[in-house]
Amino acid sequence: GQQGAGIIQENREATGMNNIDTFLQMVKESDNIVFFGGAGVSTESGIPDFRSVDGLYNQKYDCPPETILSHTFYMRHTEEFYRFYRDKMLCLTAKPNTTHYKLAELEKAGKLKAVVTQNIDGLHQAAGSKNVLELHGSVHRNYCRKCGKEFSAEFILNSKGVPTCDSCGGQIKPDVVLYEEGLNQQTLEDAVYYISHADMLIIGGTSLAVYPAAGLIDYYHGKK
């Protein structure tokens, strides 16, 4: 690889042919690529980034999303949590976009080894990606806190109030990492493994503002 090429950061302004050519050349020469992505990857699919200024923050709710999407709020105001969650977080009609499909192609070609994502929408898998490490969980996995039975996102969307288990009546919780909750240790370890072994790390759609996820890129030792 090229010496000191640094990490490739997706940049809308940097679309001069030169950069694109360099980028494609790097992809061509790499066979152990890891993609690290955030909300920006899914905005083209119509999924709002609730951290952006024109994202969900300005929409009418009594509390900011960061408060509602916290463990404390979920425990204390579960019904209100679900009102927001159904309304804003379950974008089940969204379809994968070019980025999702391109990454799935790179994986199929044996070049891309893993997608590490901060997104919870499952669009990478919908596009055909197999090895997707979801740092913040997925809206498509929901489980009963009492018996552990799993439920689909559609089940949550179509339920009323606080969704309950149709087997034991227990409360259902989405398998997404809320504020105040820790990331899944295994997913983190897997992400560290893939990033530290990569020969190319592509970063897209993230401001790297969320820790500990953002700290993961420090494990990258490649040249590009």
Regions found by a protein language model. Give the residues of each.
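Conserved catalytic core of sirtuin-type NAD+-dependent deacylases
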Residues: 4, 8-224
